[in-house]
Regions:
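SDR active-site strand-loop-helix element
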Residues: 7, 32, 76-79, 117-123, ...
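Active-site Tyr-X1-5-Lys
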Residues: 147-175, 205-210
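NAD(P)H-binding glycine-rich loop region in Rossmannoid oxidoreductase-like domains
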Residues: 59-98
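N-terminal Rossmann/SDR dinucleotide-binding element
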Residues: 1-75
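Active-site "gating" loop of Rossmann-like NAD(P)-dependent oxidoreductase/epimerase domains
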Residues: 81-94, 101, 112-115, 120-153, ...
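Conserved cofactor-binding/catalytic machinery of classical short-chain dehydrogenase/reductase
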Residues: 61, 102-105, 116, 124, ...
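A conserved pocket-lining segment of Rossmann-fold NAD(P)-dependent short-chain dehydrogenase/reductase
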Residues: 88, 143-148, 174, 180-193, ...
Length: 350
């Protein structure tokens, strides 16, 4: 029976991972976050009470709680991070302070107490790599100039990867995983009308629900390999289980190369699908696709990546894993999940 510490347990990955752990294993979850709305059903479920332990707190404040639970648990997942591009551009220091500085003591505690650290790197570390597939072992990590603060997230995560690798050279048991555009219900709030305040699928979905125009940044030609959250969690469960130590000292891309679509394609797919739902059809009819520049949308410090496809050979072979959810099913699952929230999202327009 493993004890799994999830910092950021109420976040997108955290709440989906907790649910899967409680449903399919006998492991205990010890979670901290500043809110508990996404995990309220887990906390209220009588059958999980003995295995779901939650503390409302902040990793930058409740440092003694964090260290105590790093010592107590077997596997440590520090999932607290800012991961929205508009924030990279507008508040780069805030991104660095949380994503790197606040997480560094947790990494050090995992090394000190001999725990398995499962750390979320990011597909962003590859930056503007020119490879057709990004290889965790061989691809170069290429970022833009200093006057483009959008790279602060990529650089903060890359630096942490290198620090963790350094601790690994001194005995830390670690696994780095790089999510490639994981999507699903609960990614961001659809109740956020401000452009750039959430990630692309949720942003577009909120616009469709409210009948607002969808803005394509620089024409929407940028492509992304989208990965359904359930597929990502499948891989994470295997990493945490770490059968025969297979995941120790490894870096895994977790993504779905077959779901590689442009942002313009994504907008079209979502509008077409919305027309099939009575709850969304009226809003979708009012949506126009308009073009904008990255400077107008994100700010002058933005720079984009045109293609981002993961090489997942080692992930599949070593973990016995493969992504199985295509793009159409991924989007339909998201549309189904949000049906009950349509009225709330529309109310933002009133």
């Amino acid at each position: 029976m493993k004890k799994v510490l999830i910092l950021g347990v109420n976040g997108f990955i955290g709440h989906h991972l907790s649910k899967r752990i409680l449903e399919t294993t006998d492991w205990h979850v010890y979670g901290m976050d500043m809110m508990s709305d996404r995990i309220s059903e887990l906390l209220d479920n009588e059958s999980y009470k003995s295995r779901m332990h939650f503390f409302e707190g902040d990793i930058t404040i409740n440092k003694e709680w964090v260290e105590y639970h790093v010592k107590k648990c077997d596997v440590i997942l520090p999932l607290v991070a800012i991961a929205t591009p508009s924030t990279y551009v507008k508040q780069p220091l805030r991104v660095f302070e949380l994503d790197f500085e606040a997480n560094l003591p947790i990494v050090r505690s995992a090394a000190k107490y001999g725990k398995h650290l499962v750390f979320p790197s990011t597909s962003e570390v590859y930056g503007m790599c020119h490879d057709e597939e990004f290889d965790p072992e061989n691809s170069e990590l290429i970022c833009g100039p200093i006057n483009k603060p959008r790279w602060i997230y990529s650089n903060a995560k890359q630096l942490m990867d290198r620090v963790i690798w350094g601790y690994g050279m001194e005995g830390l048991n670690f696994t780095l995983f790089r999510p490639f555009n994981w999507i699903g219900a609960g990614l961001d709030s659809i109740h956020t009308p401000k452009e750039g305040s959430s990630r692309v699928v949720t942003q577009f979905f909120g616009h469709i629900v409210r009948g607002e125009n969808i803005s394509l940044v620089d024409g929407g030609a940028q492509k992304r390999a989208f990965t359904y959250i359930d597929d990502g969690i499948d891989a994470l469960i295997r990493i945490i289980a770490n059968k025969d130590g297979v995941a120790s000292g490894k870096i895994y891309n977790i993504g779905n190369p077959t779901n590689n679509y442009s942002i313009r394609d994504l907008a079209g797919m979502m509008l077409t699908l919305a027309a099939e739902y009575p709850e969304y059809a009226d809003g979708a009819k009012q949506v126009k696709i308009v073009e904008t520049t990255s400077g107008a949308y994100y700010g002058a410090g933005y720079q984009d990546v045109q293609n981002r496809v993961p090489k997942i050979t080692n992930t599949c072979e070593e973990l016995g894993w493969a992504p199985t959810t295509n793009m159409a099913d991924s989007l339909r699952n998201i549309f189904d999940a949000y049906r009950s929230q349509v009225a709330e999202a529309k109310a933002l327009m009133d």
